[in-house]
Amino acid sequence: MSEQESHYGIFTKKCNLLLEENEIRFAGLLDPMGNLVSGGFKKGIEPLKDEVERKKMFMEAVLRVKTRQDFDDNLGPVRYAASRRDAVVMMTFPVLHDHVLLISAEPHVDIDKTAKKIMSICKF
């Protein structure tokens, strides 16, 4: 098993733990090309976008994280970024140097509290 496959296995477990949280709808690890390599939707959750739109959203999330890293030298690294929408809260966490943990949560969540919980569960 490669080191990368080992990381994916670890993140599969972490995503499953995150999905046990009531407020989390989706937890997935995206590779640098925006491919979902582990995780997914909580059982019983209906995706709000079709597969093509989700793939586009995944690629855009990775690109946004990468773009923010251009400012790490001056401002320090981004721990997470979040956007509150009417239907969901989306959160991204840079992990494994060039991967992204993408979280979709219920729209009523306290973003900072949820982010701290995610970082605690994932230990980063």
Residues of each region from the PLM?
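Non-catalytic interaction/Regulatory regions outside core domains
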Residues: 1-124
